[in-house]
């Protein structure tokens, strides 16, 4: 029995591991697993993926010499063990907090984080670039991308496999096969890996049909290997190091290994969590006030699909997060989880639309970026009736730069034929869904944020909202705030506070971001009052920029206008409220800006009420 003990908080770098024997490495794995469970139970985080790669990460740092040898963690949410072994365990108390430890690899955080990830399927292409640079510069180091079986379904990963195999350069690809991405994996490639995973002969011969998939691409295939047997993983890593050309090492792991609630998870619930009770596996959550935005949209989609057999739903590997499981159960023949394949999902929706179907593409804002060409070339250019549910629109908080949903307005605004909308509450969400599926003049995007909806009672209503028509919530007199979605609440609170001080500030619900309500804008501009636009998205190319363009195009002069939104930078992780406050997107920020504009217009005065 080993008496090995190591204070994880005192680790500076991975060099100490070279002195450990297998039994001590196994003890280290147990300590790290316990640390991860205790730490994430307080902070939340991607516990499932990290518990699954404890032994693999230890074996990698034992066999290689980071940072000289380059580890590239595809997606990056499974990099916690790597962070512990590279001297960051003492920062886990700040994991995913504002100014704290990032939940993904971060180059500025450590020399051991050689490439930043967050989205899926990028590691192999990055690795290809590194090995080409290495060989041109005649340098000597290993490049080791670690990619999951879910990420391997992404088209970018397959493009890279094709090129890497053709180049024949030295590279060791680690395929971390845990039979999951966030939700269970789908697709033919997943089925091939499943056959390899359960084959007794695959270790004994390189000529088996399934293993030949990788060998025909030009890779030496090793595996499948038990990813929780440190000694076996190290043995095969050493074998891979001696090989010439690209090697694919197939490692089979168990997501959530060592913590029963996470191990038994088949839905993806333990992929990423908030705080939880270690003893029971129950999540610690504030009392739920209302349904999530995703549920509101999904429930309305089900209602509409019950009345119209042409409605189908598509998701790129996010059925749980997008709350489409109930739809899939109700209409299995009309539900399509295409895997991590945003480009395919978008053009598939276009194809469905050409045949008179009514596709609903449920996709996170951050992942819609990956299908921009398909939106432009295949959907918008052909003016096809595709309804796009843009989930997680706006700031998402703890997941940080790679996942903030702040770019979609800017990149959709510039595409002809695109309609962009965002509801302020559940009623308006249903109305916009009904409007979108009644619209027959091109693509229709509905943005909705992460988290709970406001909790407005939904009544049966078939009211459609005319395209481009805004809602006047408070009639403007002294100034006006134009905004949409969750920032409506901030605007109303600011208007209420300013009314106490004697000012009548209008609030306009600009639920259509594109097209603008031109008639209402003309009316407001003729009042010659200060205009403040507010958006939880980028200012460049955003809603406020569209209003400015309208003002210029219509030759309005001497307009006092200001835009509040997010600056031209990537927004780091942290509490959404703290981030918003830092950019003036708060009740106080709005009040101060309105007063500043009133002073500029000469209307700032003493209280009159």
UniProtKB/Swiss-Prot annotation:
GO terms for molecular function: 1-deoxy-D-xylulose-5-phosphate synthase activity; magnesium ion binding; thiamine pyrophosphate binding. InterPro entries: Dxylulose-5-P_synthase (IPR005477), THDP-binding (IPR029061), Transketo_C/PFOR_II (IPR009014), Transketolase-like_Pyr-bd (IPR005475), Transketolase_BS (IPR020826), Transketolase_C (IPR033248), Transketolase_CS (IPR049557). GO terms for biological process: 1-deoxy-D-xylulose 5-phosphate biosynthetic process; isopentenyl diphosphate biosynthetic process, methylerythritol 4-phosphate pathway; terpenoid biosynthetic process; thiamine biosynthetic process. Thiamine diphosphate binds at residues 77, 118-120, 150-151, 178, 259, 342. SMART domains: Transket_pyr. Pathway: Metabolic intermediate biosynthesis; 1-deoxy-D-xylulose 5-phosphate biosynthesis; 1-deoxy-D-xylulose 5-phosphate from D-glyceraldehyde 3-phosphate and pyruvate: step 1/1. Mg(2+) binds at residues 149, 178. It is an enzyme of class 2 (transferase). Its EC number is 2.2.1.7. SUPFAM superfamilies: Thiamin diphosphate-binding fold (THDP-binding), TK C-terminal domain-like. GO terms for cellular component: cytosol. It holds the Pfam family Transket_pyr. Binds 1 Mg(2+) ion per subunit. Binds 1 thiamine pyrophosphate per subunit. Its cofactor is Mg(2+); thiamine diphosphate. It catalyses: D-glyceraldehyde 3-phosphate + pyruvate + H(+) = 1-deoxy-D-xylulose 5-phosphate + CO2. Keywords: Isoprene biosynthesis, Magnesium, Metal-binding, Thiamine biosynthesis, Thiamine pyrophosphate, Transferase. Belongs to the transketolase family. DXPS subfamily. NCBIfam families: dxs (TIGR00204), PRK05444.2-2 (NF003933), PRK12315.1 (NF008968). Homodimer. Catalyzes the acyloin condensation reaction between C atoms 2 and 3 of pyruvate and glyceraldehyde 3-phosphate to yield 1-deoxy-D-xylulose-5-phosphate (DXP). This is 1-deoxy-D-xylulose-5-phosphate synthase. It comes from Listeria monocytogenes serovar 1/2a (strain ATCC BAA-679 / EGD-e).
